[in-house]
Amino acid sequence: MDSILKSYLQIFFSFTILFIALTSSGCTRLYFGPNNVPKFSTTQPNELGPTVSVWEDGLRTSGDRNEFEWWYLDAKLDDGSVLVTYFWKVHFIGDQYFIGFNYRDKNGNDFFKLKYFRSKDVSFSSDSCDVVYGNNSFKGNLQNYTIKIDPDDFDGIGINLNLKSTLKPYRPQDGIIKAGDDYFAWLSAVPNGVVSGDLIVNGEKTRLSGSGYHDHNWGNTPLQYLFDNWVWFRGEIEDKTIVAAVLYMTDKRGGYDVPILYIADSSKVHVNKFGEDGLYTRKSTRITDLYNKHNEPLFRELDMITEDGFKVNIIGHSVIDNSNLFKRGRMPYPIRLAMGAAKIDPFYTRFDSEMSLSIEGETPKTGFGVFEIMDLK
């Protein structure tokens, strides 16, 4: 009993000391990193050329400290349901591997679960997208993908999907945003594709069909060291696919807003702009019902216009996912409490969204998509 009590007291006092150390300014320094860091450069990597190679969707990190990587899929299905899954690897405090799976049925009923895996149960390939977590997998070659979620890992709900790309892969320049040696990277491997396959619920299969999207992200430094937040969108209007984002750099990195806009159909790419002159953005409709009152302003509406006559309006409506990132990352409660005292509460929010596209000289058209907010403060 004495040894149990001693162990308990050691743990208690360790967390108490940690809590005191992390409160207020100490907590802020720990989370946001050092002040003396390289600023974002207006000249970004541009060496790979316009053609995306299969290896680019393979493993891009080596497992070094502070590296992270994920492969993402979302699908808007013909029956009105929405499906999202992502395979993550993170190397911040130890090595963590997990899958997030979110399914919203046509009636608005939500299912969401995170499942963690041991390092011995996961594998990757640097030659192509070949990601295996236990009996779950995400595999493909830029043209065709298979995505499997094992119902045994997700409370009886799973998928066995095929994704066939209808557009060439897209990345802005090399897809890498750097500040010194620190970087964040993004590849839209399948800007738009046709989804088919099965939804499995308690052993019963239902055929699914619709449109899908797959991208791949990786980096070598905590996201909050680079960005305050970002917004991202992918959607469809008739035959056109739209991918849009604005990355809001931290003041320490220069405080730049970096817009990205891609509009394409099977015939050509109509817009491909990355942090360029001639692309303007506006955010509006402040969110008041999802975050605490101390949170910095975040908005559910984004407008983008180009100097050559393209206008995009995006509005996030029903919430698909709204998660505190500390809770999702299984951060210990005393640290979460300390972060909260320092008014640091990062959230990830995803909306089922509407959009409109106006092209000069044409009638405006409307469509749908997925709108994401990554709040890192």
Task: Walk through the language-model features, giving the residues of each.
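Bacterial N-terminal signal peptides that target proteins for export
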Residues: 2-13
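Structured soluble/peripheral alpha/beta segments that form catalytic or ligand/cofactor-binding pockets
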Residues: 28-377
